[in-house]
Amino acid sequence: MSKTEPSPRRQGAGSFFGRRRGKTLTALHAGLIQQMLPSLIVDLERPAPPDLALLFPVAVTRIRVEIGFGGGEHLVHEAENHRDSGFFGVEPFVNGMAKLLALVSRKELSNIRLYDFDAALLLDWLPANSITPN
């Protein structure tokens, strides 16, 4: 992509999700979005590493993806019970992302990475055959 072309994220082409925001975030949730999310977000402007395990600070042997995690309860449950798996959670709804960040912080999980826009873009970015089948 050239520097003059807008990124697909800014264009929003092909997006298939609903609203991005709900009620006003609490101070805690707004702080988590500002301070914690940048360290967990996947940067699709950079090429995906051939081994996605390199994106996690802990050793992971499997890669799983959860699209549309809502408030994150299921994603956190799975991440707690499968600490050898790296999880990519996708949720464009800011309020859901904030709820997940609170859970990740409370449970001190290191095997989760996040994306806050169109899941199709993340799926296109992932290397072929990188997601572990269940």
Task: List where the protein language model places each region.
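S-adenosyl-L-methionine-dependent methyltransferase catalytic core, i.e., the SAM/SAH-binding region
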Residues: 8, 109, 132-133
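A short acidic, Gly/Pro-enriched loop at the edge of an enzyme's catalytic core
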Residues: 124-134
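SAM cofactor-binding core of SAM-dependent methyltransferases
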Residues: 62-124
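S-adenosyl-L-methionine
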Residues: 1-65, 73-82
